[in-house]
Amino acid sequence: MIRLQRITTADTDLYSYMEKLMTQSFPSEEYRELEELRKYTDTKTHFYNNIIFHNNSPVGLITYWDFGHFYYIEHFAIDPAQRNGGYGKSVLNHLCQLLK
């Protein structure tokens, strides 16, 4: 079962997992400076930094913005060891249901 968990920098292990996956999955010019990302995660109430879980094991990350009238997915990555298992499709379906 897919589950999203919003995180902050206080969730040290999960936040470290997210930063590692972010830096592995995207070129540095495609994500904010990590210090800025930490600030956004902790202070921007309409920014959602989430770990994706499947059966209570982390399998990826998804960040998005809630602008009231629409949502904007900023980053979405599945852990390389978990890719090609259908998680991407499952996450997008789950998110569509969640944000209806």
Language-model-detected regions and their locations in the chain:
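Glycine-/small-residue-rich active-site loops that bind phosphorylated ligands and cofactors
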Residues: A10, D79, R83
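Conserved acetyl-CoA pyrophosphate-binding loop and the N-cap/start of the following alpha-helix
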Residues: Q82-H94
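Conserved GNAT acetyl-CoA-binding A-motif
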Residues: Q97-K100
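Active-site rim helix/loop that mediates acceptor-substrate recognition in acyltransferases
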Residues: F26-H54
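Conserved beta-strand in the GNAT
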Residues: I51, S57-W65, F70-A77
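Short amphipathic alpha-helix that is part of the acyltransferase structural core
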Residues: M1-E36
